[in-house]
Amino acid sequence: KVDKRLAEQGISRLEIGREAFIEECYKWREEYGTTIVNQIKGMGCSCDYSDEHFTLEPAYVRAVRKLFTDWYHEDIIYRGKRIVNWCPHCTTAIADDEAEYVDEAGHLWYLRYPLTEPVCGLEYLVVATTRPETMLGDTGVAVNPKDERFGHLVGKTVKLPLVDREIPIFADWHVDMEFGTGCVKMTPAHDPNDFEVGLRHNLEVIRVIADDGHINENGGPYNGMDRYECRKAIVKDLEEQGYLCLLYTSPSPRDKRQSR
């Protein structure tokens, strides 16, 4: 709620700094805290309302930090890289219940990925994506182990369009051979399913989108572009170079905390 309030003012938590952001959180608590407690009471929750605490109170914060530190040193928890819902406006993670799917003007692009060396007359595979800009971070193409159409290609490689990087073709049960073309581009850094598949096959993780939604240094000539501008540029380049096949409309997730 505080992030949304700041966004309505055209600012972000990063611009005002940690201390100022916490002050805004306290203001929000002063404004809505009583209402929230009354709602909890209205639901019949049996609590000791004489001993209320705010999660940003210094003592509370210290206790949480100590607990997590202790758990880390006791190997109860660990810190690792995982895919999460992310808002580039707030530059914060988004809970699953704060992400919603809206049917807007999104597309599903079908792209040609040329084989490094033609096999039995086949020169390319066709993959589909709703986010062409993520192809800059592709590190593999997966097929179903039982798919006879592509079994002879497992172990071969394709050349990633625009990037000219060789990436492997491999088999994984995650692929539904009845859906789409039966070939799935793998971008472990930008898709939760791809990330899990990547762990199983030791795929390289190449992140191409920064926290603020712009393409990073791994994006080559697209470095610094907003992801949507990059999408347009990549689609244009793919079409001009003969790699674009088809496109369809598809829904996309959006952070419902953001009104823009």
Model-found features: residue ranges?
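Conserved small/polar residues in nucleotide/adenosyl-binding loops
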Residues: 248-255
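Short acidic beta-strand-loop surface patches of small beta-rich interaction domains
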Residues: 214-218
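NTP-handling and nucleic-acid-processing catalytic cores
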Residues: 42, 46-47, 53, 57-212, ...
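Catalytic palm subdomain of template-directed nucleic-acid polymerases
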Residues: 219-223
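N-terminal Rossmann-like or analogous alpha/beta NTP/dinucleotide-binding catalytic cores
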Residues: 1-69, 73, 197, 224-242
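Acidic/polar loop patches that form or flank catalytic/metal-binding clefts of enzymes
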Residues: 78-81, 243-247
